[in-house]
Amino acid sequence: MKSSAQLCMEARNYNFNAAAPLRLYLATCVRLVEEAQAAAQADDVARAYMLYVRYLDLCMHQLSGHREVQQPVTDAERLSRDEYEQLLRLEVPAVLRLTEELKSAVDLRHERGRASLARSVVPEAGRGEHSRQEVQLPPSFDEERFNRTVQWFLAAGRSMSLPVSAEEPAVREVFSYPELPKLSMAAESWAPS
């Protein structure tokens, strides 16, 4: 899980086009809040926090310098500016409160995750750093054949050219798996009776 600082950086990483109409960004703001609410209801605290921070950055930093907010020309632009100002008065304070609550939840989960990870990484007391565990191989294991196969793959990896001819006995031997059943594709086995 990411920390609140990492999520803030991620939230502020988006492209803002000042030439796009203000009404499109207002619709984007509504969509961001809807998605953040859905994420919060689904208990995806990190995503909800990131979306709310992106919403706040868009409303309070990016859109405040938008041309249609600064100098609206048409009636439609004035209407969009009024909607933006209403958004700042009514929604932004509520989203700020939600974001602060989510920030503490995100940081708490992040710290718990780090502590849990630290516990799982630290070796248990009394265990050697390089303890070995004996593994019992099956009786069908052929160590000589295994070593030949490993050597073949090492040689093939160095030359970067694997032999592809099925006629070569070494290749046939490497790619035959005796422990797997052999399937017969004879025509008589598929004929209807």
Swiss-Prot record:
Gene3D superfamilies documented for this protein: Phosphotransferase system, lactose/cellobiose-type IIA subunit (1.20.58.80)
Single annotated GO MF: cysteine-type endopeptidase inhibitor activity
Listed GO biological process terms: ubiquitin recycling
Gene Ontology, cellular component aspect: endosome
Superkingdom field: Eukaryota
Alphabetized UniProt keyword annotations: Endosome, Protease inhibitor, Thiol protease inhibitor
Subcellular location(s) per record: Endosome
Purpose of the protein: Inhibitor of the DOA4 deubiquitinase involved in the regulation of protein degradation by the proteasome and maintenance of a normal level of free ubiquitin.
UniProt similarity note: Belongs to the RFU1 family.
PANTHER family: AMSH-LIKE PROTEASE, FI19924P1
Protein name listed in UniProt: Regulator of free ubiquitin chains 1
Source species: Eremothecium gossypii (strain ATCC 10895 / CBS 109.51 / FGSC 9923 / NRRL Y-1056) (Yeast)
Protein encoded by which gene: RFU1
